[in-house]
């Protein structure tokens, strides 16, 4: 006979066995994760007990209601993952990394509660639609994470009740702000080679159905070692270097093909214009069909209490947009309806002059011409160009080596080769050196679908001067 998967022999007291099985299951919790498979936590291990208690707080459960990829679900049908699943994943990767690092640096084990709690809570301050509204409304989710950790919250009470490590909340805030010593502990959670990026590249790639973010996670983790003298983490060996190079190219591809996908840009711009209209109407004392106080204060840039901020999530924001479909203002009503029904704006890349750099004066002139022509066309369709036309720019570096002049220079990826050479990655790798020096800035025209057929004509018109100059040159040659 089997009870809970355990064979019971004749004569054994079943009641006692059932009690033992129950105690085992009560102590352990398993999260079935599509990326990391079984994430098992055990209450008998202090750091894992802390994690379990933090997961059960209302502040952390809120992350279930915030999309990891903002509005990317409009572009990729599977992009429905939450900040909750990502945060649990980051904690799990951090735990794996500690296991690897402690083989040569046993002292890191005493920091396990701090590292795991920091990894778990690093994103607890995200607002509705994650980074999308953060960029639109100019707030800092990391600052909100610190306020939630240090405020009058369930998270703070769990941290204060963890007697194995006093002042844990203050230590986590310092670690997230990169003010904690030793500094390499912060690098585990936030750096150019951190557990946050490892998880989101794997997870976002999986959820969007793309292969760009695949990386050799275990090989990278095995190659990482602590250099206590330099207070940093280094990647050791040729195999580790190769895996890190692949990781950086994967990050580049994820930004180019997923995060900055043209439909994602259009969806973000659409939401930005919708919220811009809301803010304009608020200034005009418009009487909305619906608007709760925390949302009004948030959109207006007013100071929020932690409780007010915690009431904001994707569900609440989407409910507002649903209600605004019934609003009396025709522009807000139209933008809200288009957003809900995925009749979103479109986007097209504005091509720079032949051989011209994005930042030169000629290209700026082209962008301005394209925007002005589009505004005139939109106006002819009876739409307000202020809310139906935009220029979006994208630019990023998959790896940013240390620059002394930078205000907040990111940590280098340091390689220790098999021959003992220690160097910054881009100095050792020509391919990464080229990646660092590349120009990845692009400009995109955002416009309503009604004028889709006219957009190419607008681009040709903007480049007409260049075309005429080329033809004139060719004529002289002939």
Regions found by a protein language model. Give the residues of each.
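Histidine-centered, transition-metal-coordinating active-site segments
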Residues: 2-9, 14-114, 128-478
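Elongated alpha-helical scaffolds
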Residues: 114, 119-120
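Short active-site segment of divalent metal-dependent hydrolases/proteases
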Residues: 121, 125-126
């Amino acid at each position: 006979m089997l009870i809970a998967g355990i064979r019971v022999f004749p004569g054994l007291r079943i009641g006692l066995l059932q009690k033992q099985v129950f105690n085992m299951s009560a102590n352990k919790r398993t999260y079935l994760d599509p990326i990391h498979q079984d994430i098992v936590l055990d209450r008998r291990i202090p750091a894992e007990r802390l994690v379990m208690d933090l997961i059960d707080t209302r502040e952390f459960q809120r992350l279930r209601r915030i999309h990891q990829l903002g509005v990317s679900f409009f572009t990729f049908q599977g992009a429905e993952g939450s900040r909750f699943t990502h945060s649990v994943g980051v904690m799990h990767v951090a735990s794996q990394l500690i296991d690897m690092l402690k083989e040569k640096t046993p002292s890191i084990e005493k920091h396990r509660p701090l590292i795991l709690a920091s990894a778990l809570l690093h994103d607890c301050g995200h607002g509705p639609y994650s980074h999308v509204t953060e960029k639109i409304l100019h707030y800092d989710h990391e600052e909100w994470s610190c306020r939630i950790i240090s405020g009058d919250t369930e998270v703070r009470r769990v941290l204060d009740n963890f007697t194995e490590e006093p002042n844990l909340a203050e230590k986590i805030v310092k670690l997230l702000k990169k003010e904690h010593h030793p500094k390499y502990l912060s690098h585990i959670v936030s750096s150019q080679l951190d557990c946050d990026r490892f998880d989101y590249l794997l997870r976002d790639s999986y959820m969007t159905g793309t292969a760009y973010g695949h990386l050799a996670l275990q090989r990278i983790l095995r190659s990482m070692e602590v250099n206590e003298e330099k207070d940093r983490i280094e990647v050791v060996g040729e195999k580790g270097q190769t895996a890190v190079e692949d990781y950086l190219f994967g990050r580049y591809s994820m930004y180019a093909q997923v995060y900055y996908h043209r439909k994602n840009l259009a969806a973000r711009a659409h939401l930005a214009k919708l919220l811009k209209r809301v803010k304009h109407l608020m200034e005009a004392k418009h009487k909305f069909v619906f608007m709760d106080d925390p949302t009004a204060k948030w959109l207006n840039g007013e100071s929020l209490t932690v409780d007010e901020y915690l009431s904001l999530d994707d569900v609440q924001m989407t409910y507002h947009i649903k209600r605004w479909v019934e609003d009396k203002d025709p522009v807000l009503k139209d933008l809200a309806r288009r957003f809900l029904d995925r009749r979103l704006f479109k986007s097209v890349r504005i091509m720079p002059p032949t051989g011209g750099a994005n930042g030169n004066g000629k290209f700026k002139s082209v962008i301005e011409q394209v925007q002005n022509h589009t505004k005139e066309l939109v106006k002819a369709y009876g739409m307000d160009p202020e809310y139906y036309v935009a220029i979006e720019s994208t630019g990023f570096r998959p790896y940013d080596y240390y620059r002394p002049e930078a205000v907040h220079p990111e940590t280098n990826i340091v390689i220790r080769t098999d021959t003992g050479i220690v160097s910054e990655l881009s100095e050792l790798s020509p391919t990464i050196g080229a990646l660092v020096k590349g120009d990845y800035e692009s400009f995109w025209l955002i416009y309503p679908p009604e004028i889709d057929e006219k957009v190419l004509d607008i681009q040709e018109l903007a480049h007409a001067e260049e075309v005429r100059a080329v033809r004139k040159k060719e004529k002289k040659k002939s």
